Amino acid sequence: MIAVLMGGNSAERAVSLKSGEAVYQALINQNINCFEFDWHGYNLSELWQQEFDQAFIVLHGRGGEDGYIQKQLENRCIRYTGSDSNASHNGIDKARTKIIWKQHNLTLAPSIVASIHKPIEPIDFPLPWMVKPTLEGSSIGISKVDSQIQLNNALMLAWQYNSHALIEQWIEGDEYTVAILGDKALPVVKIITDQGFYDYESKYHSNKIQYLCPCGLSSSQEQVLQVIALKAFFAINAKGWGRVDFIINQHNKPYLLEINTVPGMTSHSLVPMAAKAMGMSFNKLVVAIINEI
Protein backbone atom coordinates (compact mmCIF):
# COMPACT_ATOMS: atom_id res chain seq x y z
CA MET A 1 0.00 0.00 0.00
CA ILE A 2 1.34 3.40 -1.01
CA ALA A 3 0.50 6.61 0.83
CA VAL A 4 0.53 9.67 -1.44
CA LEU A 5 1.61 12.47 0.90
CA MET A 6 0.50 15.92 -0.19
CA GLY A 7 -0.59 19.31 1.10
CA GLY A 8 1.48 20.50 4.03
CA ASN A 9 1.34 24.03 5.39
CA SER A 10 4.14 25.64 3.40
CA ALA A 11 3.60 28.41 0.86
CA GLU A 12 3.51 25.66 -1.79
CA ARG A 13 0.48 23.84 -0.35
CA ALA A 14 -1.80 24.52 -3.34
CA VAL A 15 0.79 23.20 -5.78
CA SER A 16 1.41 20.13 -3.64
CA LEU A 17 -2.30 19.27 -3.63
CA LYS A 18 -2.37 19.41 -7.43
CA SER A 19 0.78 17.29 -7.66
CA GLY A 20 -0.57 14.78 -5.18
CA GLU A 21 -3.88 14.40 -6.95
CA ALA A 22 -2.11 13.80 -10.27
CA VAL A 23 0.16 11.13 -8.74
CA TYR A 24 -2.77 9.48 -6.96
CA GLN A 25 -4.79 9.28 -10.18
CA ALA A 26 -1.79 7.81 -12.01
CA LEU A 27 -1.53 5.05 -9.42
CA ILE A 28 -5.29 4.38 -9.51
CA ASN A 29 -5.12 4.20 -13.31
CA GLN A 30 -2.63 1.36 -12.94
CA ASN A 31 -4.58 -0.49 -10.23
CA ILE A 32 -1.90 0.15 -7.63
CA ASN A 33 -3.14 0.10 -4.04
CA CYS A 34 -2.82 3.59 -2.62
CA PHE A 35 -4.52 6.33 -0.66
CA GLU A 36 -4.24 10.11 -0.49
CA PHE A 37 -3.15 11.82 2.69
CA ASP A 38 -3.53 15.58 2.95
CA TRP A 39 -1.14 16.54 5.72
CA HIS A 40 -1.84 19.95 7.23
CA GLY A 41 1.66 20.31 8.62
CA TYR A 42 0.96 19.48 12.23
CA ASN A 43 0.93 16.05 13.88
CA LEU A 44 1.01 12.86 11.86
CA SER A 45 -1.07 10.66 14.16
CA GLU A 46 -3.78 10.14 11.53
CA LEU A 47 -1.18 8.97 9.03
CA TRP A 48 0.30 6.41 11.41
CA GLN A 49 -3.17 4.93 11.90
CA GLN A 50 -3.15 3.89 8.23
CA GLU A 51 -1.56 0.69 6.99
CA PHE A 52 1.06 1.35 4.31
CA ASP A 53 4.59 0.26 3.55
CA GLN A 54 5.66 2.94 1.05
CA ALA A 55 5.12 6.67 0.65
CA PHE A 56 5.14 8.80 -2.47
CA ILE A 57 6.16 12.24 -1.22
CA VAL A 58 4.75 15.19 -3.14
CA LEU A 59 4.94 17.63 -0.25
CA HIS A 60 6.68 20.74 -1.60
CA GLY A 61 8.55 23.25 0.52
CA ARG A 62 9.10 23.16 4.27
CA GLY A 63 7.83 20.11 6.11
CA GLY A 64 7.93 17.95 3.02
CA GLU A 65 11.09 18.92 1.18
CA ASP A 66 13.33 19.84 4.09
CA GLY A 67 13.86 16.39 5.59
CA TYR A 68 11.15 16.51 8.25
CA ILE A 69 8.68 14.05 6.76
CA GLN A 70 11.57 11.92 5.49
CA LYS A 71 12.95 11.65 9.03
CA GLN A 72 9.55 10.63 10.41
CA LEU A 73 9.28 7.87 7.82
CA GLU A 74 12.87 6.75 8.42
CA ASN A 75 12.15 6.44 12.15
CA ARG A 76 9.34 4.01 11.29
CA CYS A 77 11.33 2.11 8.64
CA ILE A 78 8.85 3.11 5.93
CA ARG A 79 10.32 3.37 2.44
CA TYR A 80 9.62 6.53 0.45
CA THR A 81 10.35 8.25 -2.84
CA GLY A 82 13.16 10.70 -3.37
CA SER A 83 16.06 11.93 -1.28
CA ASP A 84 16.70 11.01 2.34
CA SER A 85 16.34 13.42 5.25
CA ASN A 86 19.93 14.70 5.11
CA ALA A 87 19.95 15.37 1.37
CA SER A 88 16.53 17.00 1.59
CA HIS A 89 17.79 19.24 4.39
CA ASN A 90 20.71 20.28 2.20
CA GLY A 91 18.62 20.79 -0.92
CA ILE A 92 15.90 23.06 0.43
CA ASP A 93 18.34 25.60 1.84
CA LYS A 94 19.63 27.63 -1.11
CA ALA A 95 22.53 29.02 0.91
CA ARG A 96 23.64 25.60 2.14
CA THR A 97 23.29 24.15 -1.36
CA LYS A 98 25.54 26.88 -2.74
CA ILE A 99 28.22 26.12 -0.14
CA ILE A 100 28.21 22.45 -1.11
CA TRP A 101 28.25 23.22 -4.82
CA LYS A 102 31.17 25.62 -4.39
CA GLN A 103 33.08 22.83 -2.66
CA HIS A 104 32.51 20.77 -5.82
CA ASN A 105 33.77 23.61 -8.07
CA LEU A 106 30.40 24.11 -9.77
CA THR A 107 29.65 27.48 -11.39
CA LEU A 108 27.35 29.79 -9.42
CA ALA A 109 26.37 33.44 -9.47
CA PRO A 110 27.99 35.51 -6.68
CA SER A 111 25.71 35.81 -3.64
CA ILE A 112 25.45 36.70 0.04
CA VAL A 113 22.96 35.76 2.75
CA ALA A 114 21.04 38.57 4.46
CA SER A 115 19.60 37.88 7.92
CA ILE A 116 16.68 39.81 9.37
CA HIS A 117 18.53 39.73 12.70
CA LYS A 118 21.72 41.58 11.74
CA PRO A 119 23.06 44.25 9.37
CA ILE A 120 23.64 43.26 5.77
CA GLU A 121 27.27 42.83 4.79
CA PRO A 122 28.57 44.90 1.86
CA ILE A 123 27.52 43.58 -1.54
CA ASP A 124 30.59 43.44 -3.77
CA PHE A 125 28.95 42.33 -7.02
CA PRO A 126 27.09 44.62 -9.42
CA LEU A 127 23.39 45.24 -9.87
CA PRO A 128 20.90 43.95 -10.80
CA TRP A 129 20.32 41.39 -8.04
CA MET A 130 17.85 38.61 -7.38
CA VAL A 131 16.51 38.38 -3.82
CA LYS A 132 14.85 35.18 -2.65
CA PRO A 133 14.00 33.40 0.62
CA THR A 134 16.54 30.71 1.38
CA LEU A 135 13.90 28.11 2.30
CA GLU A 136 11.09 28.45 -0.25
CA GLY A 137 10.58 26.87 -3.64
CA SER A 138 8.37 27.61 -6.66
CA SER A 139 10.00 31.07 -6.88
CA ILE A 140 7.88 32.26 -3.95
CA GLY A 141 8.91 35.58 -2.42
CA ILE A 142 11.50 36.46 -5.05
CA SER A 143 12.22 39.89 -6.51
CA LYS A 144 14.52 41.40 -9.09
CA VAL A 145 16.35 44.44 -7.72
CA ASP A 146 17.54 47.01 -10.26
CA SER A 147 18.66 49.71 -7.83
CA GLN A 148 19.89 49.92 -4.25
CA ILE A 149 16.69 51.69 -3.22
CA GLN A 150 14.62 48.61 -4.14
CA LEU A 151 16.63 46.26 -1.94
CA ASN A 152 14.81 46.91 1.32
CA ASN A 153 11.38 46.09 -0.11
CA ALA A 154 12.74 42.95 -1.74
CA LEU A 155 14.25 41.80 1.55
CA MET A 156 11.04 42.55 3.45
CA LEU A 157 9.15 40.34 1.00
CA ALA A 158 11.65 37.48 1.27
CA TRP A 159 11.76 37.76 5.07
CA GLN A 160 8.02 37.16 5.22
CA TYR A 161 8.82 33.52 4.46
CA ASN A 162 11.90 33.00 6.61
CA SER A 163 14.51 35.04 8.42
CA HIS A 164 17.27 34.60 5.83
CA ALA A 165 17.32 35.80 2.24
CA LEU A 166 19.75 35.15 -0.57
CA ILE A 167 20.97 38.17 -2.52
CA GLU A 168 22.36 36.87 -5.78
CA GLN A 169 23.83 38.58 -8.81
CA TRP A 170 21.31 38.63 -11.64
CA ILE A 171 22.54 36.64 -14.62
CA GLU A 172 21.00 37.76 -17.90
CA GLY A 173 20.29 34.78 -20.09
CA ASP A 174 18.02 31.85 -20.90
CA GLU A 175 16.58 29.49 -18.30
CA TYR A 176 16.81 25.72 -18.59
CA THR A 177 15.95 22.83 -16.33
CA VAL A 178 17.20 19.26 -16.18
CA ALA A 179 15.05 16.54 -14.64
CA ILE A 180 16.81 13.57 -13.08
CA LEU A 181 15.46 10.06 -12.66
CA GLY A 182 17.73 7.64 -10.85
CA ASP A 183 21.21 8.18 -12.25
CA LYS A 184 20.05 9.56 -15.60
CA ALA A 185 19.39 13.10 -16.78
CA LEU A 186 16.25 13.55 -18.87
CA PRO A 187 15.98 15.82 -21.94
CA VAL A 188 16.61 19.49 -21.15
CA VAL A 189 13.65 21.88 -21.11
CA LYS A 190 14.03 25.56 -22.03
CA ILE A 191 11.75 28.05 -20.26
CA ILE A 192 10.73 31.26 -22.04
CA THR A 193 8.81 33.80 -19.95
CA ASP A 194 7.52 37.30 -20.61
CA GLN A 195 7.78 38.12 -16.89
CA GLY A 196 11.53 38.76 -16.91
CA PHE A 197 12.05 35.73 -14.71
CA TYR A 198 10.28 32.46 -13.95
CA ASP A 199 8.22 33.37 -10.87
CA TYR A 200 5.36 31.61 -9.05
CA GLU A 201 2.70 33.24 -11.23
CA SER A 202 4.50 32.09 -14.37
CA LYS A 203 4.96 28.55 -13.11
CA TYR A 204 1.39 27.81 -12.13
CA HIS A 205 -1.03 30.35 -13.57
CA SER A 206 0.35 31.80 -16.79
CA ASN A 207 -0.52 30.49 -20.23
CA LYS A 208 2.08 32.77 -21.86
CA ILE A 209 5.09 30.74 -20.75
CA GLN A 210 6.74 28.64 -23.44
CA TYR A 211 8.46 25.36 -22.70
CA LEU A 212 10.74 23.96 -25.37
CA CYS A 213 11.69 20.30 -25.36
CA PRO A 214 13.76 19.71 -27.48
CA CYS A 215 15.33 22.78 -25.92
CA GLY A 216 17.14 24.14 -29.00
CA LEU A 217 20.67 23.58 -27.69
CA SER A 218 23.14 21.51 -29.65
CA SER A 219 23.50 17.92 -28.48
CA SER A 220 26.90 18.73 -26.98
CA GLN A 221 25.54 21.78 -25.11
CA GLU A 222 22.62 19.74 -23.81
CA GLN A 223 24.98 17.03 -22.65
CA VAL A 224 27.07 19.61 -20.76
CA LEU A 225 23.98 20.71 -18.83
CA GLN A 226 23.00 17.12 -18.09
CA VAL A 227 26.47 16.29 -16.77
CA ILE A 228 26.52 19.37 -14.52
CA ALA A 229 22.99 18.61 -13.31
CA LEU A 230 24.00 15.10 -12.26
CA LYS A 231 27.10 16.44 -10.47
CA ALA A 232 24.95 19.00 -8.64
CA PHE A 233 22.34 16.37 -7.77
CA PHE A 234 24.80 13.88 -6.34
CA ALA A 235 26.88 16.60 -4.63
CA ILE A 236 24.11 17.03 -2.05
CA ASN A 237 23.58 13.23 -1.95
CA ALA A 238 20.17 13.47 -3.59
CA LYS A 239 18.60 10.28 -4.93
CA GLY A 240 15.58 8.93 -6.76
CA TRP A 241 14.42 11.92 -8.72
CA GLY A 242 14.69 15.69 -8.80
CA ARG A 243 15.26 18.73 -10.96
CA VAL A 244 18.18 21.11 -11.38
CA ASP A 245 17.68 24.63 -12.74
CA PHE A 246 20.17 26.67 -14.79
CA ILE A 247 20.62 29.93 -16.57
CA ILE A 248 22.95 30.25 -19.57
CA ASN A 249 24.37 33.74 -20.15
CA GLN A 250 25.12 35.46 -23.46
CA HIS A 251 28.58 33.86 -23.51
CA ASN A 252 27.01 30.38 -23.34
CA LYS A 253 28.25 29.87 -19.78
CA PRO A 254 25.83 27.85 -17.61
CA TYR A 255 25.18 28.88 -14.00
CA LEU A 256 23.46 26.65 -11.48
CA LEU A 257 20.41 28.23 -9.86
CA GLU A 258 18.90 25.67 -7.51
CA ILE A 259 17.82 22.08 -7.00
CA ASN A 260 14.37 20.68 -6.33
CA THR A 261 14.30 17.34 -4.50
CA VAL A 262 10.49 17.08 -4.69
CA PRO A 263 9.61 18.75 -8.01
CA GLY A 264 6.09 19.57 -9.11
CA MET A 265 3.97 16.92 -10.75
CA THR A 266 1.15 19.14 -12.06
CA SER A 267 0.00 19.70 -15.64
CA HIS A 268 2.44 22.65 -15.83
CA SER A 269 5.33 20.73 -14.29
CA LEU A 270 8.64 20.16 -15.99
CA VAL A 271 9.65 16.65 -14.92
CA PRO A 272 6.59 15.08 -16.62
CA MET A 273 7.31 17.22 -19.69
CA ALA A 274 10.90 15.97 -19.91
CA ALA A 275 9.77 12.39 -19.39
CA LYS A 276 7.18 12.73 -22.15
CA ALA A 277 9.90 13.96 -24.53
CA MET A 278 11.68 10.63 -24.10
CA GLY A 279 8.48 8.65 -24.60
CA MET A 280 7.54 8.09 -20.96
CA SER A 281 3.91 8.68 -20.02
CA PHE A 282 2.92 10.32 -16.73
CA ASN A 283 1.68 6.97 -15.41
CA LYS A 284 4.98 5.27 -16.23
CA LEU A 285 6.95 8.16 -14.74
CA VAL A 286 5.15 7.76 -11.42
CA VAL A 287 5.97 4.04 -11.35
CA ALA A 288 9.59 4.75 -12.35
CA ILE A 289 9.95 7.15 -9.40
CA ILE A 290 8.59 4.47 -7.06
CA ASN A 291 11.01 1.94 -8.51
CA GLU A 292 13.90 4.19 -7.46
CA ILE A 293 13.03 3.75 -3.76
Curated annotation (Swiss-Prot):
A GO cellular-component term linked to this record: cytosol
Database matches in Pfam families: Dala_Dala_lig_C (PF07478)
GO molecular function: ATP binding; D-alanine-D-alanine ligase activity; metal ion binding
Cysteine pairs bridged by disulfides in the record: none
Family matches, as PROSITE patterns: ATP_GRASP, DALA_DALA_LIGASE_2
EC id: 6.3.2.4
Positions of ATP binding: 124-177
InterPro entries: ATP-grasp (IPR011761), ATP_grasp_subdomain_1 (IPR013815), D-Ala_lig_Van_CS (IPR000291), D_ala_D_ala (IPR005905), Dala_Dala_lig_C (IPR011095), PreATP-grasp_dom_sf (IPR016185)
Predominant localisation class: cytoplasm
NCBIfam families assigned to the protein according to its UniProt record, in alphabetical order: D_ala_D_alaTIGR, PRK01372.1
Family: Belongs to the D-alanine--D-alanine ligase family.
Name recorded for this polypeptide: D-alanine--D-alanine ligase
UniProt lineage: Bacteria, Pseudomonadati, Pseudomonadota, Gammaproteobacteria, Candidatus Pseudothioglobaceae
Gene: ddl
